[in-house]
């Protein structure tokens, strides 16, 4: 029997982190007089997120077991021309899952931050930002209308700007946060157009009301064109997702977001911001199901991102950037699943990925602490014996990432690969190849990172930059060069994230994908897009799936990539340099990130500046100021000078003027009566 959730309890979920953010951001900083210290600041923000997590967990239980649902408007902001602008919550299986993921990962990041940022001058400000980030994401996922979705969408973009540029005295951080902000504005332009078209043609911003008119929208085309309205709407919405979820070619901001502190890298990449685009497309599934063109576009973009962003992870030497490029690749996998109409598989991978990606980022931060802020993996090695907790949790996260059977990533990633294999849409063949090849690439760069950091010869004493801190330096200064394990406040979140990274897939795949957990939230036309039905026929339980996975191509591709990484970096460490020399053009292409940054900076940015300069000098200075503004007063001055000469004071001049006037009038009347 379906039950109704409490509006007051749901309202407390986003408001509790907001209250903590306001307390730390106002009372804990110079803005509010520093009334509260560090301990109270982090205690209040952690308490707020803890309250949100507890209520979210209770909500998930009510939704999953008791069948509870909630879809109500809490406040009507305004009504303009029949278009209602409201604040409300929609809580179903998709929302409840996202609420738990966001709040749990955020809670782990908050606790971790106590140890990681302990000596940073902006300690209280950072806690305020990450709590505000959590509030923004919760408002986004809990919304029941597109206006509130958009406000949450923009809020996570704004707070990510503040967090990426948290160390605002660093030029690279300021460049990175501006880059993220501008690239996301490109995507948001498409997002706004999509929402605007829905509002214009459906007459509503409410999800349920708009989806009820989906069939009507599917029959509309733009006047004078053969373009289906729903296709244009879906592509516009997906352009927004391309920016927020860093899909090709709007992916360029995400690697540079590593300029922010490691805790926020984990939060952005695991549970907030980049997952917003995936969530939004899944939420809009009733619209996307009406356009095969849009779905194919989504699938191909995701496939390109999954494979080609993975290649870039192979050559990275910064420990955080390797993990960042793995995020880009995994987001591509989720996007491919969306394009195959396997929306539930996409959000399932979103959930599993959130745990092991947060784990890998926080483990990377732990290594950075232990290595006294050396982030170059070429100058690590042998760290396992110095940092046992970080080592074992990193290994578990890596095994989950590459899709090892029984680990969380296996169940979601293999489901994506099977869904694409069963898809009949245009582009599915390329996407299937891309996600299969991506398995090998992911395993290779993941274990390259693992072996270079935790195994092999100790190289940290050979680091030529040993006395200089990496870009994630926030005030810690190690006097000894030997690595050391991080404090418990850092390692406990690693352990707590490692647990779901191992077991969450086995525990939840059946109810989430085949038990109807998302039945009220996600719509799939199984007659046109039967991939999920085919997966259901093939599924015989998580244990059987793991056994079958041992014989499937993804497992052997992952094993091959792992073994190759072991051979190249443990057995024959001279081989990578030889391969680099042999394929220098390929390395140069990858090292320059396919020249996207060069193109954006030298063609788009410089071209825009040149166009702006030309319009300024030619249009503004010469045409507007020169011809219109200055030209008008010059013309008036010239006419005034001519007229002034006629006012001479001589009577015969005025008589002459009168005669000319009479002659002109007579001529006019004669012509008029001819």
What is each PLM-predicted segment?
Residues 47-63, 187-200, 394-402, 493-516, ...:
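Hydrophobic alpha-helical membrane-insertion segments
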Residues 108-152, 158-480, 506:
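Hydrophobic transmembrane alpha-helices and their helix-loop junctions in integral membrane proteins
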Residues 25, 29, 56-67, 107, ...:
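Transmembrane helix-loop junctions and nearby membrane-interface residues
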Residues 69-84, 206-222, 412-423, 511-544:
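Membrane-interfacial helical/loop segments at transmembrane boundaries in membrane proteins
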Residues 2-16, 36-47, 83-101, 139-152, ...:
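Membrane-entry segments of alpha-helical transmembrane domains in multi-pass membrane proteins
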Residues 36-51, 178-190, 385-395, 450, ...:
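Alpha-helical transmembrane segments and their helix-start/interface "positive-inside/aromatic belt" motifs
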Residues 1-11, 15, 27-128, 201-225, ...:
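Transmembrane helix-loop-helix hairpins at membrane boundaries of multipass inner-membrane proteins
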Residues 82, 87-90, 510-556, 566-674:
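Aromatic-capped, Gly/Pro-kinked transmembrane alpha-helices
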């Amino acid at each position: 029997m379906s039950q109704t959730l409490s509006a007051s309890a749901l309202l407390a979920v986003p408001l509790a982190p907001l209250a903590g953010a306001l307390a730390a951001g106002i009372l804990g900083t110079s803005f509010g007089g520093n009334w509260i210290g560090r301990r109270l600041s982090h205690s209040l923000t952690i308490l707020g997120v803890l309250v949100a997590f507890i209520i979210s967990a209770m909500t998930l239980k009510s939704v999953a077991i008791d069948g509870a649902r909630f879809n109500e408007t809490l406040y009507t902001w305004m009504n303009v021309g029949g278009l209602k602008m409201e604040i409300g919550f929609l809580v179903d299986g998709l929302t409840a899952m996202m609420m738990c993921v966001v709040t749990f990962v955020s809670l782990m990041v908050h606790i971790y931050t106590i140890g990681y940022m302990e000596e940073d001058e902006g300690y209280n400000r950072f806690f305020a930002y990450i709590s505000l980030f959590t509030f923004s994401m919760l408002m986004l996922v809990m919304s029941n209308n597109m206006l509130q979705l958009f406000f949450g969408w923009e809020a996570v973009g704004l707070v990510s700007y503040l967090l990426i540029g948290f160390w605002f005295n660093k030029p690279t951080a300021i460049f990175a946060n501006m880059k993220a902000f501008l690239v996301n504005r490109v995507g948001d332009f498409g997002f706004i157009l999509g929402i605007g078209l829905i509002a214009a043609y459906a007459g509503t911003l409410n999800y349920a009301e708009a989806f009820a008119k989906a069939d009507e929208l599917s029959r509309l085309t733009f006047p004078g064109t053969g373009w289906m309205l729903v296709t244009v709407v879906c592509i516009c919405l997906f352009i927004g997702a391309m920016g927020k979820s860093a899909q090709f070619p709007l992916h360029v901001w995400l690697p540079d977001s590593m300029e922010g502190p490691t805790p926020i890298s984990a939060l952005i990449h695991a549970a907030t911001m980049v997952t917003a685009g995936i969530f939004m497309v899944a939420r809009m599934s009733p619209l996307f199901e009406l356009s095969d063109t849009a779905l194919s576009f989504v699938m191909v973009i995701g496939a390109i991102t999954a494979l080609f962003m993975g290649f870039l992870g192979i050559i990275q030497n910064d420990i955080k950037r390797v993990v960042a490029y793995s995020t880009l690749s995994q987001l591509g996998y989720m996007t491919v699943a969306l394009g195959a109409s396997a929306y539930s598989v996409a959000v399932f991978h979103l959930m599993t990925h959130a745990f092991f990606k947060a784990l890998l980022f926080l483990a990377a931060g732990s290594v950075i602490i232990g290595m006294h802020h050396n982030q170059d993996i070429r100058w690590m090695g042998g760290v396992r014996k110095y940092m046992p907790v970080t080592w074992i949790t990193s290994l578990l996260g890596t095994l989950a990432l590459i899709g090892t059977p029984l680990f969380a990533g296996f169940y979601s990633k293999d489901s994506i690969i099977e869904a694409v294999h069963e898809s009949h849409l245009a582009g599915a063949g390329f996407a299937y190849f891309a996600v299969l090849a991506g398995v090998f690439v992911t395993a290779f760069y993941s274990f390259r990172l693992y072996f270079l950091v935790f195994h092999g010869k100790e190289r940290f004493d050979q680091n030529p930059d040993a006395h200089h801190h990496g870009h994630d330096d926030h005030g810690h200064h190690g006097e000894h060069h030997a690595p050391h394990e991080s404090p418990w406040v850092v390692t406990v979140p690693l352990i707590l994230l490692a647990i779901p990274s191992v077991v969450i897939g086995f525990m939840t795949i059946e109810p989430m994908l085949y038990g109807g957990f998302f039945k009220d939230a996600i719509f799939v036309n199984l007659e046109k897009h039967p991939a999920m039905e085919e997966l259901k026929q093939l599924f015989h339980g998580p244990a059987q799936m793991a056994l079958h996975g041992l014989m499937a191509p993804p497992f052997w591709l992952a094993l091959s990539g792992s073994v190759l990484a072991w051979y190249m970096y443990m057995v024959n460490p001279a081989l990578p340099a030889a391969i680099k020399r042999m394929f220098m053009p390929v390395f140069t292409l990858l090292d320059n990130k396919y020249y996207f940054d060069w193109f954006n900076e030298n063609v788009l940015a410089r071209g825009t500046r040149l166009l702006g300069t030309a319009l300024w000098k030619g249009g503004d200075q010469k045409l507007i100021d020169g011809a219109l503004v200055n030209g008008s007063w010059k013309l008036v001055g010239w006419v005034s000078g001519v007229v002034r000469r006629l006012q001479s004071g001589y009577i015969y001049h005025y008589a002459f003027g009168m005669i000319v006037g009479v002659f002109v009038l007579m001529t006019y009347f004669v012509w008029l009566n001819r």
